[in-house]
């Protein structure tokens, strides 16, 4: 899903991560949105969500999934092979945590998509953590 969003010779892009809680310790990323980027402000090293478009996509995904898929965070691209979050990325993640009503409380996720790898960061209201997601099939 996220690999298809890699940035090669263009501006950064961004969108929404949708997921569901499958246990106290596990969150599943069910799907990702198409771009929700405000194209008028996108640069090679910067992008901003179009809040109106993002909110519309969040509502559509929630309704389409019989209220099981919710906003769990955001994805964006970086023009580098092995991405790491910038100071602005961490500030943005913290702001999103503080201003959004989170359906799954106490965390928000950010996926930073580089050309060769993806960096996942989580914020729990106090600490930023790197996470390594595990990939499972739908049959388990």
Task: For the regions a language model picked out, list residue spans one by one.
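Conserved beta-strand-loop surface patch within small alpha/beta domains used
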Residues: 1-71, 79-140
């Amino acid at each position: 899903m996220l690999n298809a969003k890699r940035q090669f010779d263009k501006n950064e892009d961004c969108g929404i991560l949708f997921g569901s809680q499958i246990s106290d310790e596990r969150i599943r990323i069910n799907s990702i949105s198409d771009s929700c980027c405000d194209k008028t402000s996108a640069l090679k090293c910067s992008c901003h969500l179009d809040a109106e478009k993002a909110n519309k996509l969040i509502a559509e995904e929630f309704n389409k999934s019989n209220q099981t898929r919710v906003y769990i965070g955001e994805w964006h691209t970086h023009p580098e092979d092995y991405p790491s979050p910038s100071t602005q990325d961490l500030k943005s993640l913290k702001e999103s945590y503080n201003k959004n009503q989170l359906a799954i409380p106490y965390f928000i996720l950010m996926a930073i998509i580089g050309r060769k790898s993806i960096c996942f960061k989580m914020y729990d209201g106090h600490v930023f953590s790197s996470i390594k997601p595990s990939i499972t099939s739908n049959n388990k």
